[in-house]
Amino acid sequence: MPQIGDDAISRDGKVLILAMDHGLEHGPVDFEPVPETIDPSTVFDVATHDAVTAMAVQKGVAERYYPSYEDDVALLAKLNGTSNLWMGEPYSPKNWTVDYAAELGAEAVGYTVYSGSNHEPEMYEDFREIQENARAHGMPVVMWSYPRGQGVKNDTKDDVIAYGSRIALELGADVAKVKYPGSKEAMEWAVDAAGNTKVVMSGGSKVDDLSFLRSVEAVMEAGGAGLAVGRNVWQREEPERILDALEKVIYEGAGAEEALD
């Protein structure tokens, strides 16, 4: 089994995944704040920063852009996704396979699971297949663990987020990507619930530098392994500046204010 902490998507046991699956999940609107980011090459360039341990993208972007960056960026293949146009119960169908991701040079795979949705049984079965195939390839598995749907009344509650991290452990993920529950204490509960599965924070919508870094600082103090972030990096005019600060907080244990100095 891959040991997260000594693999291609981590650094000293810590993780900073730069995600850019937003074009499918949210649409081009997410690129409007910094229009040049609609070109995936712009974000791949950002991902060459030393702080970034992997870049998560969908199949088409990986096919067309990753070959130019394979020496500088570790590819995390995001194997499922759905558009913002979908109006039914939360569901994220599989769009490509572990085998094909491995052919393209992926170092790891990622998969979203919406526990509590009416589509939970299909998503669990898809995740089982992906997890077992990833094991055969020696690739770590990151679960985007987002409980939501008819079975979930409030997906931001502390116990719901902790349940999400526990589900990632129970189903065999190496890393659980969960929402930040809003406090260090609540994050500690999510980390404890995950056992020895690493827990990373979802970056979420863009906020100011200090607020963002304070949440990352709290995650690290709670025993989290880092974060998976998109908009809070590449929606900034100077993404390298925030990555410099994240490097200090995640890998060096700096506080938010210190990291911005």
Please tell me what each predicted stretch does.
Residues 227-234:
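Short acidic/histidine-rich active-site segments
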Residues 25, 234-235:
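Generic, ordered loop/turn and secondary-structure boundary motif
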Residues 201-203, 229:
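Thr-Gly-centered strand-to-loop micro-motif
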Residues 10, 15-55, 60-84, 89-199, ...:
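Alpha/beta enzyme core
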Residues 1-13, 234, 240-261:
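N-terminal charge/polar-biased segments
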Residues 29, 238-239:
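Short capping/connector residues at structural and topological boundaries
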